[in-house]
């Protein structure tokens, strides 16, 4: 198991792909710090880990608040002394809304969580990885296939995910001098509470509604383990993992 003795942090670890990634990293031997708003949801994730639960720490964290992120990393520093892997996963969305009907409050909410929160956590991880001995680590940002091709009515979400792509490239570039690698996983239709609506049908670019296939979220966990376990001389800069038959290529 490549993760033995290594410390990983997963944000948004209480459900969905964050939960899948947490459990996969634990199975690989990592010690995992879970961060999220809901302590009860994170404890539920830990309850699924069996004997691996002994290698977990759950920290209630609002990633949009700088003080909360600082407190999270101080706790990691105090308890473990270092951080080897970050899965920067926390995110959210608003209901599908035509761009002309979107309010600034909706826009700001998505930007605060998906972009500002991602920055705050990645920035704190970068600083910790730069200062620790041995130096370095790996940051994995959760992008989306919306970082490539938008859905109808998803301007805020799509804009933030395109921005994450730019931030991933910048972190990867700036991190070279400190042995900090940064990659991005772009996920399409993992079966989670966030994608439950796919079974009821979602708007398509041609104006129709279509039921879309999903994939087991465990596929995301396996991909995170692969990305996290690469040698320091390699980086999976961008990885797309999606339901095989979902509309994506041309959104058709």
Predicted feature residues:
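Active-site helix of classical SDR
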Residues: 122, 160
């Amino acid at each position: 198991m490549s993760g033995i003795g290594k410390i990983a942090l997963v944000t948004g670890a209480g459900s969905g792909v964050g939960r899948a990634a947490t459990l996969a990293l634990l199975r690989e031997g990592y010690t995992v710090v879970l961060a999220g708003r809901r302590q009860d949801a994170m404890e539920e994730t830990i309850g699924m880990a069996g004997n691996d639960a002994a290698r977990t720490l759950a920290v209630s964290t609002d990633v949009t608040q700088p003080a909360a992120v600082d407190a999270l990393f101080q706790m990691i520093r105090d308890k473990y002394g270092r951080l080897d892997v970050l899965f920067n996963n926390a995110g959210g969305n608003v209901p599908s809304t035509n761009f002309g009907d979107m309010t600034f409050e909706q826009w700001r909410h998505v930007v605060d969580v998906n972009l500002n929160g991602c920055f705050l956590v990645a920035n704190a991880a970068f600083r910790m990885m730069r200062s620790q001995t041995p130096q370095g680590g790996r940051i994995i940002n959760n992008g989306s296939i919306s970082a490539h091709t938008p859905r109808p009515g998803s301007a805020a979400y799509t804009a933030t995910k395109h921005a994450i792509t730019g931030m991933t490239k910048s972190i990867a570039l700036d991190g070279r001098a400190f042995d900090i690698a940064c990659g991005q996983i772009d996920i399409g239709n993992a079966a989670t509470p966030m994608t439950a609506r796919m079974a009821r049908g979602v708007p398509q670019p041609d104006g129709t509604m279509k039921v879309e296939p999903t994939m087991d979220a465990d596929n995301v966990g396996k991909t995170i383990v692969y990305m996290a376990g690469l040698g320091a001389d390699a980086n999976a800069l961008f990885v797309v993992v999606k339901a095989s038959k979902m509309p994506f290529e041309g959104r058709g």
